[in-house]
Amino acid sequence: MNNLKRLTKTIFSCFTLSALLLLAGCETLPPMTDLSPITVTDARQATAWELQGKLAIKTPDDKLSANIYWRHSEDRDELTLTTMLGTTVLTLNSTPNSAHLHIDGKDFRDDNAQRLLERVSGWSIPLADLPLWITGQVGPNDQVIVRDSQGKPKQLTNTQTPPPWQVAFLSWQSQSGASVPHQLKLERSDLELKLQLNQWQALGKPAILVGEQP
């Protein structure tokens, strides 16, 4: 059984269990208690954010759909995939120097999140670049092919690691006061990812009131 089929089976098993018992499953992410919702005028102003949405992964052999929850800051990422009933089937927590993946009741560790996810799941997903694309930005290895009338990217190519990623910004929305993508499509060789952001919230350090102890 390939890795994607194993993960699909895991999600189906957790979905069945939650349907029968109405219990949330494998693992719950700890909250980022040091961050609070903020409003920004440009997504680049948000050094931290959280999103809720849907992720679809397709290969020639299989396909997978799941809810995605992602909390991102400059030094920490917490990514969770769940079934439609909310049962957690995969969590990936990482810092710049460490990564911990929990899937199918097993724990895996590495010092690189992208390498860890590829080793366990078989997906070569550009985790380092996704935070830029999710906020409508482009990186130094991105070549913008098409922009819309407002100058926002519609299509780009990422050539950091061949074969290149083709990224399409299918639609945009206003969230937390900023314009961010609503739907993204990533294609590379025989792997296709579709990401829909249903909610994107900019996060920041809470303000310290006068007279309040830091």
From Swiss-Prot:
InterPro entries: LolA/LolB/LppX, OM_lipoprot_LolB
Organism taxonomic ancestry: Bacteria, Pseudomonadati, Pseudomonadota, Gammaproteobacteria, Alteromonadales
A Pfam family hit: LolB
Protein name stated in the entry: Outer-membrane lipoprotein LolB
S-diacylglycerol cysteine lipid sites: C26
Subunit structure: Monomer.
Taxonomic superkingdom: Bacteria
Lipidation (N-palmitoyl cysteine): C26
Membrane topology: Lipid-anchor
Keywords in alphabetical order: Cell outer membrane, Chaperone, Lipoprotein, Membrane, Palmitate, Protein transport, Signal, Transport
Family named by the database record: Belongs to the LolB family.
Chain's role: Plays a critical role in the incorporation of lipoproteins in the outer membrane after they are released by the LolA protein.
Main location per the UniProt record: membrane
Source organism of the structure: Shewanella baltica (strain OS195)
Stretch forming the signal peptide: 1-25
Record's GO cellular component terms: cell outer membrane
Gene: lolB
